[in-house]
């Protein structure tokens, strides 16, 4: 039992220290105090831009990648894109209802990780987290690569430089996000709404031309670049459906980012989700319908969007340039959704001890800087490795997010089951929320259950049809990441157990402190270090590793003058090793120390005035 007979003195004060002006503050803005955090939230309009740009921008590549697969059966098979896109819209409707319930059940943030952790356990939670983290990285790579593809459609001369253009865009978004969520929200709102206005205007004008009978078809369509025609099969249709479902990968972003919204958070986030789904569904249906009727052909050299816009506006005039520019920008902005959610999810994992704790630290602008920089770095490596090709990246995409969809919806279905079997005055307190009796639990459980079954089916289709194309990488990577997460968690648990004061006996009073101080020579620094060591104990041993007999003799001579009576131990090292003889000596002293003794190692360090001169002393 620890005695408390001594007075406890705890003093607390707030320091007024602010980081000094630097290149970082010039790029990122003035540092924000922790008290500024409540003011760094956003409303529905900004929230729609920040968290929906990923989903909205997918209309630029979702229909294209779906039609690209159908094109393997010949241009005549492209009409099947219409029933496929209606099936995707139905799936979007199911997901919207499912995630709207999640948002209200988890007002503190209801991503797949939290829902799975609270309702299914740690293994499903880490699986969902690994899948989502992987998907966010791929979101950045795919969105930026698709944005560059739009740019190349308008300016073919940029094709050889597409990889470095993509990497530059990723770094630009990284810097913007390091400035903070509020500033990045305002930055991204204008181009997002600019894209929506132009795209809806284009679709509406296209339908007007269609219904008046003067829409026409694509003039000078690009080559599809397909060497041979395959027979139309169920497997091919399922592959096209799997590619098209990549348009739904951004649906979960709002439920992950609830804490970024102003109060009432759940209401604002829920309404934003509904508006996002309406906009996404409308654009998906409209763009696919018009693309099929103008006989647009999927191609690496020109995107479906480019063909659609130039057909509707009769050429590459002002409206074409505006639409392609807006599409390019929204695809770049889509990567911002991942930059908003990846650091938060990483911080959640780190807070639970499954990722390095450094990811929980907020930078000078109240954002998780470590997560933002890590995301930019890994996504850039992916873009370089896959040469900024959307077609090559797509097979890796979506399987992870549909796995997280499935786990999230399964967790929610289990939550409603628990809620339905509670008494009216009962509640279960979980880390992410509080479960109370809900009279509508059956209805809600069925909605989330349907969502889980639907997304599990899509995930299976994607895994089977895209396995050879690259889905196998994600299938292997996800359990590997989960293994790494649990290894990190095991380390933190062991460390916490070792450091725990629970059941810890009263510390024994130290009766002796032995000080060992290694030195390379006798000079002003050595004398100062010796004076410091002598304040710790009267038992000070200075150790010199001898690799040059002449230098050692000089040190002995100086020690007689400056050693102040303290002992000097010289360890000869015939093979010029330094660390090993020193550690061996420390082990020898440790072996003979008494129970109430401690050993302190004092290591004098030379700190040069200029950082670059460190290279001269290594």
Regions picked out by a protein language model, each given a short descriptive name:
Residues 1-35, 493-503, 507-618:
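Cytosolic C-terminal regulatory domains/tails of membrane transporters and channels
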Residues 67-117, 122-126, 142-169, 277-283:
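Extracellular loop-to-transmembrane helix junctions
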Residues 122, 160-167, 260-282, 350-384, ...:
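Loop-to-transmembrane helix boundary motifs in multi-pass membrane proteins
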Residues 193, 200-249, 465, 469:
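Helix-loop-helix junctions that connect adjacent transmembrane segments
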Residues 196-222, 287-295, 408-424, 487-496:
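Hydrophobic alpha-helical segments and their helix-loop junctions in multi-pass secondary transporters
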């Amino acid at each position: 039992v620890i005695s408390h007979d001594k007075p406890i003195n705890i003093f607390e004060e707030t320091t007024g220290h602010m980081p000094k002006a630097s290149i970082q503050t010039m790029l990122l803005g003035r540092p924000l105090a922790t008290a500024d955090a409540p003011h760094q939230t956003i409303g529905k309009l900004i929230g729609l831009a920040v968290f929906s740009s990923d989903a909205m921008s997918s209309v630029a590549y979702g229909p294209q990648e779906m039609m690209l697969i159908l094109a393997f059966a010949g241009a005549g098979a492209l009409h099947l894109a219409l029933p496929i896109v209606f099936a995707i819209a139905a799936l979007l409707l199911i997901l919207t209802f499912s995630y709207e319930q999640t948002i209200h059940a988890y007002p503190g943030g209801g991503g797949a990780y939290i829902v799975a952790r609270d309702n299914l356990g740690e293994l499903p939670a880490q699986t969902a987290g690994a899948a989502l983290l992987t998907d966010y990285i791929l979101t950045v790579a795919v969105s930026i690569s698709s944005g560059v593809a739009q740019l190349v459609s308008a300016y073919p001369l940029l094709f050889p430089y597409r990889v470095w253009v993509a990497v530059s865009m990723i770094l630009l978004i990284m810097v913007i996000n390091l400035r903070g969520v509020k500033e990045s929200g305002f930055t991204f709102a204008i181009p997002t709404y600019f894209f929506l206005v132009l795209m809806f205007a284009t679709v509406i004008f296209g339908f007007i031309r269609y219904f008046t009978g003067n829409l026409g078809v694509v003039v000078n369509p690009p080559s599809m670049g397909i060497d041979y025609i395959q027979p139309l099969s169920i497997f091919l249709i399922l592959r096209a459906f799997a590619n098209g479902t990549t348009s739904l990968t951004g649906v979960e972003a709002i439920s992950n980012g609830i804490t970024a919204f102003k109060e009432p958070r759940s209401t604002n986030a829920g309404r934003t989700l509904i508006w996002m789904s309406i906009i996404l569904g409308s654009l998906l249906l409209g763009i696919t319908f018009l693309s099929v009727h103008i006989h647009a052909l999927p191609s690496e050299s020109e995107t479906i969007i480019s063909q659609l816009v130039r057909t509707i506006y009769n050429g590459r005039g002002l409206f074409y340039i505006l639409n392609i520019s807006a599409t390019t920008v929204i695809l770049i902005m889509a990567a911002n959704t991942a930059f908003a959610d990846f650091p938060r999810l990483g911080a959640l994992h780190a807070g639970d001890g499954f990722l390095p704790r450094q990811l929980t630290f907020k930078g000078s602008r109240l954002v998780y800087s470590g997560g933002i920089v890590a995301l930019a770095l890994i996504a850039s490596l992916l873009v370089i490795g896959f040469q900024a090709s959307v077609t090559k990246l797509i097979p890796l995409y979506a399987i992870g997010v549909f796995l997280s969809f499935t786990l999230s919806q399964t967790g929610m279905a289990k939550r409603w089951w628990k809620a339905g079997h509670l008494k009216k005055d009962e509640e279960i307190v979980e880390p992410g929320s509080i479960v109370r009796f809900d009279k509508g639990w059956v209805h809600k459980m069925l909605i989330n259950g349907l969502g889980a079954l639907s997304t599990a089916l899509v995930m299976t289709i994607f895994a089977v049809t895209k396995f050879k194309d690259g889905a196998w990488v994600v299938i292997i990577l996800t359990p590997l990441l989960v293994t790494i997460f649990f290894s990190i968690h095991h380390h933190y648990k062991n460390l916490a157990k070792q450091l725990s004061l629970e059941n810890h006996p009263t510390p024994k009073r130290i009766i002796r402190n032995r000080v060992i101080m290694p030195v390379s020579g006798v000079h002003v620094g050595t004398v100062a270090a010796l004076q410091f060591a002598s304040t710790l104990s009267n038992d000070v041993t200075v150790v010199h590793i001898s690799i040059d007999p002449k230098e050692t003799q000089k040190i002995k001579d100086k020690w007689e003058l400056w050693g102040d009576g303290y002992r000097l131990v010289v360890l000869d090292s015939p093979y010029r090793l330094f660390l090993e003889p020193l550690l061996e000596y420390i082990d020898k002293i440790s072996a003979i120390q008494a129970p109430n003794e401690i050993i302190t190692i004092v290591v004098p360090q030379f700190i040069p005035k200029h950082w670059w001169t460190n290279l001269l002393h290594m």
